[in-house]
Structure formats: C-alpha cells, structure tokens
C-alpha cells in the first residue's frame, strides 16, 4: 500500500511539472485562479508526502525540495517563450507547501 501511495505522490509531482511547462495549461475561469491552483497543487503535494513520511526532518527536506521545484519551474517557464515567469506563482507554491505542512502537523496531533 505504501509503495502505491509513494508512486501516486511522484506521479502527482510529475503532473505538476508537466502542467507547469505545457504551452496551454487549463485556466480557471476567474481572476488569479491560477494562483489558487498553485497553492492547492503544492499544498496537496506537501500534505501527501507528510502523510507518507512522519519524521519532521524528512518533511522539512521535502518541503524545501517542493519550494525549490516551484522556483525552478517558474524560471523554466520564463525560458520557454510560451509561458511567463511570475514571482506571485512562486509565492503561491511556497505558501501551499507551508499550508500543506501545517495542516498535516495539525491533523497529526
């Protein structure tokens, strides 16, 4: 079961990478909806891996990694010519990671 959950988590991370670099990603029908999408995507990603890894230092390492991924993907988007670099997206990704971690810690108590 754990192996399946781990594979699902990595598949979800791969989907985030794909959607971040695809030329025409799906767009929500409201202003700043993409920021909400970033927040929810990275929040769920962090929550998922916090569920799988209970040790705080392992969670911290994943959190740093997911934030770094979000930052790297924004720079990659800026280099594509079809997507744009946005600091607000990096902030939404980072906030999502922190919220996912915080919710996970709260539910664990």
PLM feature spans:
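Membrane-helix interface segments
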Residues: 1-4, 55-63, 87
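"…centered on the first transmembrane helix and the immediately adjacent amphipathic helix/loop
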Residues: 1-50
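Residue-level signature of the transmembrane alpha-helical core
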Residues: 10, 17, 39, 44, ...
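Alpha-helical transmembrane segments of multi-pass membrane proteins
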Residues: 15-20, 46-50, 66-74, 97, ...
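Transmembrane helix-loop junctions in multipass membrane proteins, especially transporters and channels
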Residues: 21-28, 54, 78, 82-86, ...
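Short, flexible micro-motifs
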Residues: 23, 40, 73, 84, ...
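Interfacial helix-loop-helix junctions of multi-pass membrane proteins
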Residues: 29-35, 73-95
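Membrane-interfacial alpha-helical segments at the cytosolic side of multi-pass membrane proteins
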Residues: 40-55, 59, 97-108
